[in-house]
């Protein structure tokens, strides 16, 4: 098509060599010592003739001769003009002829907006927690433009004699997550729950904890899949709603966007721990924080340490969250499979006395030096042991060792100074 005019490119005959005949001549010539052969070629007509193209062009001229009115039920919803019809026309070779068709994506693009007000979005199935049990909330089919039906209706109206009017309709649109999908995952009842106290927290820290809990709420971990805290929660940035809190840097608490992330990670870790899930990655805080279970805390950082655990159950796990300004709770829902976890905490060992730390602050006044008092808490190591049983049989045992540093005073040097060493650098303000 050139605009609204079909352009016919004439066909032409070709030539073809009879390969079997040529091969026989070559063999005979070789046996008789003849230096060459004469091969004959035959004329071959094109599979698609100029006449076939002219016939298709005539049909195309009819198709673009006038607009096609569009109706949905009893509603006039618009029309397709000749230029639009021309842009949608396609010529498909079919048994020695050209079959006229309309591009399906083009039909969808042009017609879907015209019937959008009559369509309905599908609703995914979901879960509703009632006490310790889970109920499946049924999904619902939606409706959308019937593209195949619209193709046939518009093409028929455009190429056949009579009224140039096409009736278009809708077809069912299934949800991405159906009721059957939801039931098949085996998410039926609570299998673990864990709550941590916020401890002393600013309003920003509480906000961040609640925000991360909302990002995690409703996460489904299918059997054999691994949960990654950083992948699910994503980067902690102001653009995603996070506020400035605090993070541990060396022996100091410093301002940082997303402070409170470790509260969330610690609560999740303890759920995975109590359910006996394999923990693929976990890191303790550099300090011991008393409002977390000793040896069972978890710290994460975007682009750095992560918390990862694997669902080794026979069914999927649904994570649900609840919180107040003083507590955070995660609950895991699945199907119970006779699992029991027995844990014990070893003694504190390898005690370390606090020593001064030396930090460099590029934002401090030139030549400055100041000391920030630490808590003077001792450092130590501790190991938590875990045994996982299923139906009374031991299936796994593992341990988690934490190394907590001693927290001494911090001497902070500004530019133009000569510290004895630099243990860490404060972020520029």
Predicted regions, residues:
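Amphipathic, non-membrane alpha-helical rod segments
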Residues: 7-8, 136
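Well-ordered beta-sheet/strand-loop patches within structured domains
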Residues: 24-429
